[in-house]
Amino acid sequence: MTSRSRQAAYSGIFINETTGEFPQKEQELFEGIVAVIAVVILTWMVFWMRKVSRNVKVQLEQAVDSALQRGNHHGWALVMMVFFAVAREGLESVFFLLAAFQQDVGIWPPLGAMLGLATAVVLGFLLYWGGIRLNLGAFFKWTSLFILFVAAGLAAGAIRAFHEAGLWNHFQEIAFDMSAVLSTHSLFGTLMEGIFGYQEAPSVSEVAVWFIYLIPALVAFALPPRAGATASRSA
């Protein structure tokens, strides 16, 4: 097991054992707070990746070469930098998966997490062995779009959790009912619920929060980088 997976597993076990002692309303409140934290972290990660994706490969290679050429002290600094980067990503994974698991959609989110971890391990070995060459710019672009839709679902789930906790009781009318078209009891509906927070009969507030988050996020993501940021990267 990799260090990242161990860190995520230990953190997940601790959080799961802690939240299991909460009363129902407090647990719903905690779920909503976790979902909000996950949305903030994922959104920050998307725009950070957008900022660095153009030159990330060259910058990483130059930083590694420079650190290794300066001697053992800088080599250990590089090791610690990688360690803390992995720890940060592991914590992000814990909050994301916890927010997904709290939606109580059965075995599919844990199964998806295991498959995702296995895929990451395989891709890591292929990249290390030089079996594939990854276009990091395109990879960050499409995964960032995917993450924005995931975050929108988490935002809608947060407002639902706050309603169940008794903190938000406005606009709770059913916006539409898609159960006849895509039920959450079907395989595909369950996958959509686990990944994107899909609800077959969402409330008006859930739909509103989904659009209020996603539309500005997509617009900001589609805008070209600021001239100042571009100039600083090219300098």
From Swiss-Prot:
Q: InterPro entries, alphabetically?
A: FTR1/Fip1/EfeU
In this UniProt entry, which cysteines form S-S bonds? none
Q: Where in the cell is it found?
A: Cell inner membrane
GO MF terms, alphabetically ordered: ferrous iron transmembrane transporter activity
Question: What membrane topology was assigned to this protein in its record?
Answer: Multi-pass membrane protein
Q: Which residues lie on this side of the membrane: Periplasmic?
A: 1-28, 99-106, 160-177, 225-235
Q: What keywords tag this UniProt record?
A: Cell inner membrane, Cell membrane, Ion transport, Iron, Iron transport, Membrane, Transmembrane, Transmembrane helix, Transport
Reading the lineage from the top rank, the first entry is Bacteria
- What does UniProt give as GO cellular component? high-affinity iron permease complex
Q: Which residues lie on this side of the membrane: Cytoplasmic?
A: 50-77, 128-138, 199-203
Q: Which residues cross the membrane?
A: 29-49, 78-98, 107-127, 139-159, 178-198, 204-224
Member of which family? Answer: Belongs to the oxidase-dependent Fe transporter (OFeT) (TC 9.A.10.1) family.
Relate the assembly described in the record.
Answer: Part of a ferrous iron transporter composed of EfeU, EfeO and EfeB.
Function text: Uptake of Fe(2+) ions across the membrane.
UniProt-recorded name of the protein = Ferrous iron permease EfeU
The opening ranks of the lineage are: Bacteria, Pseudomonadati, Pseudomonadota, Gammaproteobacteria, Enterobacterales
Tell me the name of the encoding gene.
efeU
